[in-house]
Amino acid sequence: MSGFGHYARTADELEREILKRGIAIGVDWDDPSRMRDLARRALSCTPACMMKLLRSPVRQDKLTGELFALSELMLQNMRESAEIGFETHGGPAWKAFGRALNEEFDAGVRPPEAGA
């Protein structure tokens, strides 16, 4: 299993950073409705939206943009590990946010197309 270690390590690192930003912006990991709202916003945030958040002088906006960027890395890590037959799992924040992202994606929310 050592060949899969970097996926688990990446998940741990992402979990820590997701948790820190979530706490800073007041995310309630135990509120499925609010998690889905956050996931919907993350999935529908265009590259321009992301840059606006990341460049914002408002701390809450900047942290939200960082959380959205981390969610993209989280999804990429899960997708890449799944392609080789390894399921990546993080901690409670990862699971809550990942579940909400998957539910919103299943409900039809899609990331904007590149260049859109």
Q: What role is predicted for each listed range?
A:
Residues 17-78:
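Amphipathic alpha-helical interaction modules
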